[in-house]
A protein has these predicted regions:
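Predominantly a Rossmann-like dinucleotide-binding segment in NAD(P)-dependent oxidoreductases
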Residues: 10-15, 129-134, 139-246
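Conserved acidic residues
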Residues: 41, 66, 81
Length: 409
């Protein structure tokens, strides 16, 4: 098969590493690293400087200059095989719907949605058109999450009872500088606004939408103080933004109940000083996995008394034999390509599924279930942290759907 022709919509920080100084190559860079499979033929962004940067990167990789446009609807008529969407969060769904209606397979960047109705629109559009849509939750492909999932699937963890995860990432400078869309999000909403990095791998482990589902959640928010303190203490922002009131609480915690009896704990912590952490933990009847300490604790191998706890710190490499083959074969160049290699692997699998017409590794039903947590958490917080029912976006099909792990396809 010839190379897939790709249309790329959204070429800012995440899309093309616009304005980044840390060596990031963005999603576009990782697509170009998979150049045996694809060629980017059309690019779209509202800003000409982003288009110019992306075009230079594509030409530097040895490809012809792509068609440029500022209107995403032009991309739908450019004779492409797939669309990659890395716009602002609020544009994801409408662009994806446009692509699906045009019969063009879509890869949509992650983020929540403030509207459960948007999730239903994605599901309904897929069921009407059967156009594939892939939710680009790269953390499902990360080495740690891949290992935890493999340990569960091999039975080493026993029956999974509880998982927790977090998105802990100090983004105060991003928000205050207004370099992207986060400023308006934090000003206007209070919710679990970025759930899927931690929730996606957990949902896969717990077979959500394939034998299990979320039934209800409850969210609670702390007060909002971190951004105000940061802005007032920074001369660059104090005069212009000192009086801005942010709706978003500094720490949002969410508990999710699953139909099969498991529970999930999520934490959003993005406007206080801290180090980056996703903090995946998996608690099963035979074992425990902790991403933060890179620990695997299995029944019978360790004295579970607390005084022995540190003996298991940083021992997960002892279980490397259980990693998927992609992680056993990965090169240093691929690891450096973005987010420790998971972006490269994610696109490799997406392009292979397109070429071989396989089901998407993270499909529309999973996307809807995970994204809806943002809107549902917002509702719970606004109503005094009451439990909120979670929709079944499969309309009952979850009872017979088969579990598909991302490394299975």
């Amino acid at each position: 098969m010839d190379k897939l022709k790709i249309g790329f919509i959204g070429l800012g920080r995440r899309g093309a590493a616009y304005g980044m100084t840390d060596g990031s190559i963005g999603l576009l860079g990782n697509v170009l690293r998979n150049s045996d499979d694809v060629v980017v033929t059309v690019i779209c962004d509202r800003r000409q400087e982003c288009l110019d940067l992306a075009s230079k990167k594509i030409e530097a990789a040895g490809y012809p200059a792509p068609m440029q446009t500022r209107d995403y609807k032009d991309v739908m008529n450019a004779g492409i095989d797939a669309i990659i969407i890395s716009t602002s969060w609020d544009m994801h769904v409408q662009v994806a719907l446009e692509g699906m209606r045009a019969g063009i397979p879509v890869a949509m960047e992650v983020g929540g949605t403030h509207s459960v109705e948007d999730c239903w629109k994605l599901v309904d559009c897929y069921e009407q058109t059967k156009t594939p849509i892939f939710f680009m939750e790269n953390c499902c492909y990360n080495k740690d999450e891949a290992l935890a999932t493999a340990l569960v699937r091999k039975g080493l963890m026993g029956e999974v009872v509880y998982c927790q995860g977090s998105y802990c990432h100090d983004v105060r400078e991003q928000i205050a500088s207004r370099i992207n869309y986060r400023f308006e999000e934090y000003k206007n909403y209070n919710c679990e606004n970025y759930p899927t990095h931690e929730l996606g791998p957990i949902a896969k482990i717990m077979n959500i939408t394939s034998g299990n589902r979320f039934t209800k959640l409850v969210s609670m928010s702390s007060k909002s103080a971190g951004l105000r303190e940061y802005i007032k203490g920074n001369p660059k922002y104090a005069k212009e933004l000192g009086d801005v009131v942010f709706a978003q609480g500094d720490v949002v915690t969410t508990l999710i109940e699953c139909e099969n009896g498991e529970t999930i704990f999520l934490k959003l912590d993005t406007t206080l000083p801290r180090l980056y952490e996703r903090g995946l933990t998996v608690s099963g009847t035979k074992g425990f996995y902790c991403q933060t300490t890179e620990s695997v604790v299995l029944d019978g191998k360790y004295n579970h008394d607390q005084t022995q706890y540190k003996d298991a710190f940083f021992n997960q490499d002892e279980y490397a034999e259980y990693l998927p083959q992609d992680w056993k074969d990965i090169t240093e160049e691929q690891i450096k390509a973005g987010h420790g290699g998971m972006d490269y692997i994610m696109f490799k699998h997406f392009f292979r599924c397109l070429k071989e017409k396989k089901p998407m590794p993270i499909d529309v039903y999973e996307a809807a279930a995970w994204m809806s947590v943002t809107a549902l958490s917002e509702e719970s917080i606004a109503k005094g942290s009451i439990p909120v029912e979670c929709p079944d976006f499969t309309r009952g099909k979850y009872k017979t759907r088969k579990t598909v792990d991302v490394f299975d396809v």
